[in-house]
UniProtKB/Swiss-Prot annotation:
Signal peptide: none annotated. This is Malate dehydrogenase. Keywords: NAD, Oxidoreductase, Tricarboxylic acid cycle. The keyword NAD applies. Substrate binds at residues 82, 88, 120, 151. NCBIfam families: MalateDH_bact, PRK06223.1.
Length: 309
């Protein structure tokens, strides 16, 4: 029996995620959106690309959550996109209500699913999905670190003129301005970038990574979608194939890194059933302090949500 992935939100990120997953041919796909005909049209367009691109998964679009029943993975992309001058935090009031509604409708129909949250502000929205679903924390995870690390890797590769496939990076913390890229754990074929790039250039790359989403917004007038969708597809594949991938993701911490009861980006082992292990890496005092500052920013958002409900 083929696996099933439901993507809630057929906008740019959701539809592109469906495109990338279809190309991998590892699951049947359902696109759901409140806009009439939008998910149906995009699903049909993707289905018709199958004979050319060589995939044969079923792809359907619907305005009803009933179509998602029995999903192995639910991807939540629904929400208001960032607009020029808008921080992720500005999205809080609008998107918390959207994510709560989506989760309350989708989760009961797929009680064994893994939920991957994409909606911003990401770490705060993971809390909403966790509470609304009633799922264990291991089965509610946020896509952030894969994207942030991908941006870091891309910028390092550009700096050195090497293939990004040879660059491996680690980014911790909340998905936003307070994220914590770790140059010490970033390597090119095993060589730390601290041995390859001057400190001032590393800092510039770190700052560009932190502003990665904002840079796209300023250029496009809306949020990125190719790289976020590719990052989601990688996480979905890890779950469906039980790949035990070591990836950074927004994960519910219960004391790891000295952080309690909070979603923050850290390295995890991701496979069937969601988060199999939270990996604690050794941090310097400065890195740990930066991670805690990032976590505090997330906690402030969570507290703000409580005031809004």
């Amino acid at each position: 029996m083929r696996r099933k992935v439901s993507i809630i939100g057929a906008g740019a990120v959701g539809a592109t995620t469906a495109q990338y997953l279809a190309a991998r041919n590892i699951a049947d796909l359902v696109l759901v959106d409140i806009v009439e005909n939008l998910p149906q049209g995009k699903a049909l367009d993707l289905l018709e690309a199958g004979p050319v691109l060589g995939y044969d998964c079923q792809i359907v679009g619907s305005n009803s959550y009933d179509a998602t029943a029995g999903s192995d993975v639910i991807v939540i992309t629904s929400g208001s996109p960032r607009k020029p001058g808008m921080s992720r935090d500005d999205l809080l009031r609008v998107n918390m209500n959207i994510v709560r509604s989506v989760t309350e409708q989708a989760a009961p129909l797929s009680p064994d699913a893994v939920i991957i949250v994409v909606t911003n502000p990401l770490d705060a929205m993971c809390h909403v999905a966790l509470e609304a679903s009633g799922f264990p924390p291991a089965r509610v995870v946020g896509q952030a670190g894969v994207l942030d690390a991908a941006r870091f890797r891309a910028f390092v590769a550009l700096e050195l003129g090497v293939s990004p496939r040879d660059v491996h990076a680690m980014v911790l913390g909340g998905h936003g301005d307070t994220m914590v890229p770790l140059p010490r754990y970033t390597t090119v074929s095993g060589i730390p970038i601290t041995q390859l790039i001057p400190a001032d250039r590393i800092q510039a790359i770190v700052e560009r990574t932190r502003d990665g989403g904002g840079e796209i917004v300023r250029l496009l007038g809306t949020s990125a979608f190719y790289a976020p969708a590719a990052s989601v597809a990688e996480m979905v594949e890890a779950v469906l194939l039980d790949a035990n991938r070591v990836l950074a993701a927004s994960t519910y911490l219960t004391g790891q890194y000295g952080i309690h009861d909070l979603y923050v980006g850290v390295p995890i082992r991701l496979g069937a059933g969601g988060v199999k292990e939270i990996i604690e890496v050794e941090l310097t005092d400065e890195e740990r302090a930066a991670l805690h500052r990032s976590a505090n920013a997330v906690r402030e958002l969570v507290q703000a949500m409580k005031q809004l409900t």
